């Protein structure tokens, strides 16, 4: 009797093209696939890889975060590159003059960048200006900022766990006893 071979590890799963059927995204992929092949720069390879990514792995980045990353004196005339969405941040009042390249920019963020005398360019334009990523600052949003990520980790309730419990209801009887009141063990 033969043995069954486990084929679980036979192939390395990685995206070689975007799952999306968006023709504009696929055109961008064509451009950056060419650049990744022909230029000897890591920048184009990273952009290409990120264009393939799922929405979960392309989290939005706030305007405040972009401003903070571009604050350094050495990054004065650089282009901020985001493979994803730039969103507005009401907590920041004044934004500097920025040159930004992103897949999407929300309406308010777009208005604020342009009002500050900034410039918004597309990835096609970026490929013309800087095919090797010269004078660019590549940035991305926090992937662990999602609500779902708070529930990952060691089980809620075990020592030193900061995992958020999955609660079906926020009523009096749910996750409100031990550790939440003095009369039930301890109050944290």
Swiss-Prot record:
Main location: cytoplasm
GO terms for MF: RNA binding; structural constituent of ribosome
Keywords associated with the record: Cytoplasm, Ribonucleoprotein, Ribosomal protein
Pfam families (alphabetical): Ribosomal_L18
Compositionally biased spans, kind Basic residues: 161-171, 178-188
Protein location: Cytoplasm
Record-level GO BP terms: translation
Disulfide bonds: none
Domain of life, source organism: Eukaryota
Coiled-coil stretches: none
Positions of the UniProt region annotated as Disordered: 151-188
Gene Ontology cellular component terms for the protein in this record: cytosolic large ribosomal subunit
Alphabetical list of PANTHER family matching this protein: 60S RIBOSOMAL PROTEIN L18, LARGE RIBOSOMAL SUBUNIT PROTEIN EL18
Similarity remark: Belongs to the eukaryotic ribosomal protein eL18 family.
The protein's name: Large ribosomal subunit protein eL18
Gene for this chain: RpL18
């Amino acid at each position: 009797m033969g043995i069954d071979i486990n084929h679980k590890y036979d192939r390395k799963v990685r995206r070689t093209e975007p799952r999306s059927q968006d023709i504009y995204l696929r055109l961008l992929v064509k451009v950056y696939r060419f650049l990744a092949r022909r230029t000897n720069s890591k920048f184009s390879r990273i952009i290409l890889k990120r264009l393939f990514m799922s929405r979960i792995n392309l989290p939005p980045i706030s305007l405040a975060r972009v401003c903070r990353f571009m604050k350094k004196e050495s990054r004065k005339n650089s282009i901020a590159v985001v493979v994803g969405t730039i969103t507005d941040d009401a907590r920041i009042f004044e934004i500097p003059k920025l040159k930004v390249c992103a897949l999407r920019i929300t309406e308010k963020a777009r208005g604020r960048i342009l009002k500050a005398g900034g410039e918004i360019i597309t990835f096609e334009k970026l490929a013309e200006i800087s095919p090797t990523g010269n004078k660019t600052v590549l940035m991305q949003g926090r992937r662990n900022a999602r609500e779902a990520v708070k529930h990952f980790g060691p089980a809620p309730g075990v020592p030193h766990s900061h995992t958020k419990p999955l609660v079906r209801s926020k009523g009096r009887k749910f996750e409100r006893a031990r550790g939440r009141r003095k009369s039930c063990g301890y109050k944290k």
